[in-house]
Design a protein with these regions (language model features):
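Periplasmic-binding protein-like
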Residues: 112-122, 204-231, 243, 282-288
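Secondary-structure end/capping motifs
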Residues: 233-316
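Solvent-exposed, polar/charged alpha-helical surfaces in well-ordered, non-transmembrane soluble domains
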Residues: 55, 77, 81, 95, ...
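C-terminal segment of classical bacterial N-terminal signal peptides
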Residues: 15-25
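Conserved C-terminal helix/tail region of periplasmic/extracytoplasmic solute-binding proteins
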Residues: 304-345
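Bacterial N-terminal signal peptides that target proteins for export
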Residues: 1-11, 20
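A residue-level marker of the well-folded mature domains of exported/periplasmic proteins
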Residues: 35, 66, 70, 109, ...
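Short, glycine-/small- and polar/acidic-enriched structural segments
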Residues: 28-181, 185-192, 211-213, 218-219
Length: 345
């Protein structure tokens, strides 16, 4: 099975490589790329801004606009409908779209979050101890939150009744406030997003607990660089350059975390730098540091693991079809294996 999956990915890589040579421009020109990030400007996004500040995008012939996002799931449809050329978005939202509208779905080209960050946060003294305890309770989340979108799959895997859980939507900036004020019993999100947003409100780690999806069989990839199929087909050189520049920015961020967070503060002066530095370190530790990177490198995927992720979502969410691994991710635009980070610390 693994060899079959790898063969499929290699075939797709060859197809994109052919496009890259046949579509190469006759003369150097600047390509504009609009990219939406996963959330408001925060510490873990420093690699994108370092790539910009150090001229890595420019060296690749790119002019990249990096906009704030409204959730990891929100970027995928924005790339699909042409509003953006690229996104830092959730692979699982991509799988769902590919299952429903394969012709519209974009494709992941560099997977950055290789450990599942999805969670429901509750107050430390909450009676909610297990997923079954969600029944009869109210959980809130932003409409495009990745954990909210995956909740039906979580219900099935963790064996509790989604129909007995009251779901309410809220503005992202009100999430932690509504939880601590008791307006909801739990909130959807990424562990570190909630944890550090709560810190900014003065909430200590000891005041929160997390019911993590990954503890109940949802071994999923998460955020990735996602591009439109149109861009990948018509300008593969630009996609490869985008990935190469971001990878260089990430390597620089790992070498100098302070500089990485400073690049974020340059765009959003109101951030609390010490908190955002801690947020970035925690993200590296818990969302980007899967043991597989020692072998395949950060940015790449294990095809068999990704296939299992696809199967989990298709089955649990009753999706109409099962996308192939090659529909979700292509390694065609990755830098050479020697240039991918194999160790984060």
């Amino acid at each position: 099975m693994i060899s079959t999956l790898r063969s499929a990915l290699l075939a797709l890589t060859a197809a994109y490589a052919f496009s890259a040579t046949s579509a190469a421009p006759a003369a150097a020109q600047t390509t504009k790329i609009k990219m939406v990030l996963n959330w408001k400007y925060q510490g873990p996004q420093g690699m994108f801004f370092l790539a910009d500040d150090k001229g890595y995008f420019k060296q690749e012939g790119l002019e990249v606009t990096l906009d704030q996002g409204n959730g990891s799931g929100a970027g995928v449809p924005l790339v699909a409908n042409g509003t953006y050329d690229a996104a830092f978005g959730d692979v699982n939202a991509l799988i769902e779209l590919a299952a429903k509208k394969p012709d519209d779905a974009p494709i992941a080209v560099y997977v950055m979050f290789n450990q599942p960050p999805f969670t429901v946060a509750v107050k430390a003294d909450s009676p909610i101890k297990t997923p079954k305890d969600f029944e009869g309770k109210t959980i809130g989340g932003a409409a495009n939150d990745g954990a909210l979108k995956l909740f039906p799959a979580f219900c099935k895997l963790a064996k509790f009744d989604c129909a007995k859980v009251n779901i309410t939507n809220m503005q992202p900036n009100l999430r932690e406030q509504m939880l601590m004020q008791g307006q909801v019993d739990g909130v959807f999100g990424y562990v570190n997003t909630i944890r550090f947003s709560a810190k900014l409100m003065g909430v200590e780690d000891s005041q929160l607990r997390y019911i993590n999806y990954g503890d109940y069989g949802m071994d999923l990839y998460s955020n990735a660089i996602i591009v439109s199929k149109k861009l990948a087909k018509e300008n593969p050189k630009a996609v490869a350059g985008l990935v190469r520049a971001i990878n260089r920015g990430l390597i620089d961020s790992l070498k100098d975390i302070d500089a990485s967070v400073a690049a974020v503060a340059k765009r959003e002066p109101l951030i609390k730098v010490p908190v955002e530095k801690d947020r970035f370190i925690a993200t590296l530790q818990s969302e980007m540091n899967h043991p597989e990177i020692a072998t395949i490198g950060l940015g790449n995927v294990d095809p068999e693991r990704l296939k299992k992720s696809i199967d989990i979502l298709v089955d649990a969410s009753n999706l109409p079809r099962t996308p192939a691994v090659s529909e979700i991710f292509t390694p065609a635009f990755l830098p050479e294996a020697k240039d991918l980070p194999k160790k984060l610390f």
